[in-house]
Structure formats: C-alpha cells, structure tokens
Amino acid sequence: MTKGILGRKVGMTQVFTESGELIAVTAVEATPNVVLQVKNAETDGYSAIQLGYQDKRTVLSNKPEQGHASKANTAPKRYVREIRNAGDEFNVGDEIKVDTFQAGEYVDVTGITKGHGFQGAIKRLGQSRGPMTHGSRYHRRPGSMGAIINRVFKGKLLPGRMGNNKRTMQNIAIVHVDVENNLLLLKGNVPGANKSLLTVKSTVKVNAKHPEVKMANASASATNSEEA
C-alpha cells in the first residue's frame, strides 16, 4: 500500500536531535487533503485515489469541477493528483492528514524544479569553457557540431531552457511530524521553489538499506515549525 499527501514547500530550517546534532530540514505544509474519487481495477483499469489540495474560489472553477467536488462535499480544489495503489480503505470525502506518516519513515518527494530560463551550455550543462586569452575566439560557445554530417548528433551540449522540470527525490527521511501545524519536516532539501506544490509518497525502494533516522528534539522542532 502506498501512502501519499499533497503539500507545499514552506522553506528550510534546522532542528537539533536529542544528542545536540544539527539537521537541516525542509518544512512541507500539508493541510488536510480530500479524497475526491476512488478508482479500482474493475471500473478504471487500475487502483488509485484522487486527492484534492487547497480550495479554489467558485468563480474560478467551471461546472464540471464544481460537480466533481460536490460528490465529496467539499469546495473545488486548486491541485488534483492521484496516488496509485493506496488501498481500499478510503471513501470519497475522507481527509488525509500529516499523521498518515510517522517520524523515521522514508518517502519520495516529487516537485517542479526552479526555472532559470534560457541559459548557455556552461551554466546549463557544466560544459568547460575555452581559453580566454592568447587570441582564442572560442570562449563560451557550444563548440563544433561535427565535420561533414548535415545534422546535429543527439546529446550534443547546447543552450536551452534550464530547470522547470518534474523531479523526484527518493529515500528522504521524515525527521518530525507536526500534527498541530500540519507540517512535515524532511531531512535535507527537496525539489522546487518555496510555495510550490510537492507530492509526498511512500518510498518505492522499500528494501533499500536505510540509515537510522535521528529524531528531532520535540521542543526545538515546535519552535522551528512556528518560525517556518
């Protein structure tokens, strides 16, 4: 069974363990998600639940969205995502909160990376530059496309749009769960800018050798949660 919840990235902070070790964490605010639809293999071909996150004003939603949300007795949602293989214990209208997860679990976090616009090959792909002196006229250009062929080889390092891609980071440890403030404190950083949407799901690599998660000091975590 896969557990999942939608939230938004608040930012990064730091917490201390009981032994005094400092851990950098990312705060993810995950207000209660509403189950908008339950899909099963008989009717839809696969098993999944559809989650809605953050209410959307009625004037900004169309009639199909309003009708779909009314089946769950809730307002239209700004973000709607599916969590596959979530089990059969959910019904339309149920709420999923952060207490679904516990400190010490490992999760996979999916988000949209920061966009940097159109960038050159050096910044975008880490290509080495040419000589800057001694008459060289090759500094930050992409380089030769080839000698004779009338096409560009696949994989050629070229300028282009950088960032704004969907990325998933696996095996991220949950350091602390703040049920009162609807916060998950995840160890390290996660993809995306602040306030961006994140999908937190149970890790797919359940058999991986995970190091022991050092829990955060409860009092220190509460203070940092309020700051975040």
Curated annotation (Swiss-Prot):
The keyword Oxidoreductase does not apply. GO terms for cellular component: cytosolic large ribosomal subunit. Gene3D superfamilies: 3.30.160.810, Translation factors. It holds the Pfam family Ribosomal_L3. One of its GO terms (biological process) is translation. InterPro entries: Ribosomal_uL3, Ribosomal_uL3_bac/org-type, Ribosomal_uL3_CS, Transl_B-barrel_sf. Keywords: Ribonucleoprotein, Ribosomal protein, RNA-binding, rRNA-binding. GO terms for molecular function: rRNA binding; structural constituent of ribosome. Coiled coil: none annotated. Belongs to the universal ribosomal protein uL3 family. Part of the 50S ribosomal subunit. Forms a cluster with proteins L14 and L19. HAMAP family: Ribosomal_uL3_B. This is Large ribosomal subunit protein uL3. It comes from Leuconostoc mesenteroides subsp. mesenteroides (strain ATCC 8293 / DSM 20343 / BCRC 11652 / CCM 1803 / JCM 6124 / NCDO 523 / NBRC 100496 / NCIMB 8023 / NCTC 12954 / NRRL B-1118 / 37Y). The gene is rplC.
